[in-house]
Structure formats: C-alpha cells, structure tokens
C-alpha cells in the first residue's frame, strides 16, 4: 500500500514537472523589453558596420506607449557613440569605454519585441560635433576713443557787421 501511494505521489510530481517544463520555455520566449530590443539593434549595427570600432548605446529616448502585440514594429530613437574596442574583437560593447572625441550617431527606426521575429529597420546619421575653439586668454577690451563733438564755427548774431569790408567802399 505504501509503495502504491509513493508511486502515485511520484506520478503526480512527474506530471507537475512535465507541465512546468512546458511552461518555462514559453516564459523564456517572452517579449523583449524596449531596452533589450534597442541593444539588439545596436549589436546588429556593429555587425553590419564597416568602421574600425564598436558603437555602444549612449542615450535611449522614451519608449512609445505600450502596445500589447510584441510582433508589431515599435518606433525607436537612440544615440550611440564610438568605443575604444576594435570591431573584430567581438567584445560586448557594454564592456568598452567610450572613445574620447568618438563619433556620435543618432539612430531611428523600428524594432519588434518578439525575439523570434528578427525585424529591425534602423538608420543612423552622424551628429555633427561642434568643436569649440579654445578661448584666448582674457584680455581687457580696448577702450573706444573719447567722443568729441565736431567743432562748429561761432554763431554770428543778426545785425553784426560783416567780417570783411565791402570791395568797393563807396557802393553798398
């Protein structure tokens, strides 16, 4: 009787383990998060790039409003920056430091959150970096020359005799 009860209990446990085994793979195939999908897009960008160094996620814009269907393409917008890691090393970009004065690219496109659908449509454009000219050392501004109003001839009051005598003294 004890052995029948033990085998029945063992049968139930094996049934539970079987059901759990069926549920776990479906849980692992859950939808990716927005960030994970963008990181996957950055990996694809690094794979397809012909540049010398890897790029790493610098900034991730806000995710769009929640959509229930993970198979629907979601709009993404993010910024990547060049790292010090050479592309052939195949090192994860997250472990690489950003390159000083490295290239920065703004990327936009769509990704799907379903890991079984590899739908990525991303395009990246390099952001023109604004290189600042070094400031010259502080020098005081030269002062403008003082303002002197123009000199006007003295005003002659009316009725004042003319300054020069007439050419012909007898004629007026």
From Swiss-Prot:
| Regions of compositional bias (Pro residues) in chain numbering | 136-172
Q: Give me the disulphide-bonded residues.
A: 85-96, 107-124
Tissue specificity field = Small intestine and bone marrow.
Q: Which domain of life is it from?
A: Eukaryota
Reply yes or no: does the keyword RNA-binding apply: no
Q: Which GO cellular component terms, listed alphabetically, does the Swiss-Prot or TrEMBL entry include?
A: extracellular space
- Please verify whether the record's keywords include Secreted: yes
SUPFAM superfamilies reported in the protein's UniProt record: Cystatin/monellin (SSF54403)
Q: Which positions carry Pyrrolidone carboxylic acid?
A: 30
BP GO terms, sorted:
antimicrobial humoral immune response mediated by antimicrobial peptide; defense response to Gram-negative bacterium; defense response to Gram-positive bacterium; innate immune response
Q: Where is this region: Disordered?
A: 61-80, 130-172
- PTM Proline amide: at which residues? 169
* Cellular localization per UniProt: Secreted
> Where in the sequence is the signal peptide annotated?
1-29
Q: What keyword terms does UniProt attach to this protein?
A: Amidation, Antibiotic, Antimicrobial, Disulfide bond, Pyrrolidone carboxylic acid, Secreted, Signal
What PROSITE patterns has UniProt attached to this entry? CATHELICIDINS_1, CATHELICIDINS_2
Q: What Pfam families does the record point to?
A: Cathelicidins (PF00666)
One GO MF annotation is: lipopolysaccharide binding
Its principal location? secreted
Q: What does this protein do?
A: Exerts a potent antimicrobial activity against both E.coli and B.megaterium.
The entry assigns this protein to a family as follows: Belongs to the cathelicidin family.
Q: What is this protein called?
A: Antibacterial protein PR-39
Its gene name is PR39
